[in-house]
């Protein structure tokens, strides 16, 4: 049956089922709840998802370029090519470029910075933003890098030279493999924006040591070190890059492990005592 319902100065007709009666304000509220706010939320989630994909693609192009840059393969500008300058100027510029990357990469990874940063950047895109900024700082380094062409060593034996190139490439393979072992897409932000898009809650981090992580604590960093140092031709510029990045890796490990101890406590302390930092099968000190 239909009954008149008084709403302000107007009389409305509302169909009632049994003894349940909906006021016009309740109807308005229900209509509103599936209206622009929900639609807008979905749009923003989709935009965040596209942003995460874009950041990942920039990273992917950057890491591929990094392989060519270090190994001197395919890419138009490598570690040994570019604008010729004085040695002092080249060293200063290159050190500043590496320092910029190191500061960005380390500061934005710290929990204190993340807590402050996520006041302005949505949590689901925090990791993608970090990945994007790191990629852009590396692209700047590749673009502005100054060569130092003085040869430190050059392997003349063709077989040994090929072996070193193969070892360097194996280092890059180790980097990629290690990221997939621990969840490549979470490490580079795609997992977070995908979960946000479908409305899935983020799961609390769990400490795990799959495959390579049973032998070394930081196989990704080990892969980078191998890739940077296994060079049949080592110029002064390549040596500067390899040496500074290796030093930064050890600094980064110290900062990262401090955060991991804060997060996992004794579980990570025991892992640190049991497993070597970088050298497989060597007991940790």
Curated annotation (Swiss-Prot):
- Which Pfam families does this one have? NnrU (PF07298)
Give the primary localization class.
Answer: membrane
Record field: transmembrane: 55-75, 88-108, 132-152, 162-182, 224-244
Q: Which domain of life is it from?
A: Bacteria
Alphabetically ordered keywords of this record:
Membrane, Methyltransferase, S-adenosyl-L-methionine, Transferase, Transmembrane, Transmembrane helix
| Sample GO molecular function, one term | methyltransferase activity
Q: Which GO terms describe its biological process?
A: methylation
Its catalytic activity? Answer: methanethiol + S-adenosyl-L-methionine = dimethyl sulfide + S-adenosyl-L-homocysteine + H(+)
Where is the protein localized?
Membrane
Enzyme Commission number(s) from the entry: 2.1.1.334
What is the membrane topology here? Multi-pass membrane protein
What cystine pairs are annotated?
none
What family does the entry list? Answer: Belongs to the nurim family.
The record's function comment reads:
Catalyzes the methylation of methanethiol (MeSH) to yield dimethylsulphide (DMS).
In its UniProt entry, what is this protein called? Answer: Methanethiol S-methyltransferase 1
Organism lineage string: Bacteria, Pseudomonadati, Pseudomonadota, Alphaproteobacteria, Hyphomicrobiales
């Amino acid at each position: 049956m239909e009954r008149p319902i008084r709403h302000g100065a107007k009389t409305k007709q509302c169909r009632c089922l049994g003894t349940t009666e909906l006021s016009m304000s309740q109807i308005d509220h229900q209509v509103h709840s599936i209206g622009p706010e929900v639609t807008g939320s979905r749009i923003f989630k989709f935009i965040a998802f596209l942003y995460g994909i874009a950041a990942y693609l920039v990273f992917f192009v950057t890491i591929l370029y990094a392989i060519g840059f270090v190994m001197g393969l395919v890419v138009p500008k490598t570690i040994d090519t570019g604008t010729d300058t004085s040695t002092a100027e080249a060293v200063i510029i290159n050190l500043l470029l590496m320092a910029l990357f190191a500061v960005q990469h380390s500061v934005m990874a710290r929990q204190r910075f993340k807590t402050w940063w996520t006041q302005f950047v949505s949590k689901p895109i925090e990791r993608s933003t970090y990945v994007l900024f790191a990629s852009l700082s590396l692209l700047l380094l590749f673009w502005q890098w100054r060569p130092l062409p003085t040869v430190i060593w050059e392997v003349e034996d063709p077989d040994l030279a090929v072996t070193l190139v193969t070892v360097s490439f194996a280092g890059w393979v180790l980097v990629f493999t290690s990221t997939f072992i621990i969840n490549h897409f979470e490490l580079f932000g795609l997992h977070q924006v995908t979960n946000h898009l479908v409305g899935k809650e983020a799961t609390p981090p769990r400490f795990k040591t799959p495959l390579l992580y049973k032998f070394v604590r930081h196989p990704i960093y080990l892969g980078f070190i191998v890739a940077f140092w296994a060079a049949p031709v080592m110029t002064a510029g390549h040596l500067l890059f390899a040496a500074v990045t290796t030093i930064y890796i050890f600094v980064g490990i110290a900062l990262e492990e401090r955060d991991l101890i804060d997060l996992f406590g004794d579980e990570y302390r025991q892992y640190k005592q049991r497993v070597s930092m970088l050298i497989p099968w060597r007991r940790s000190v």
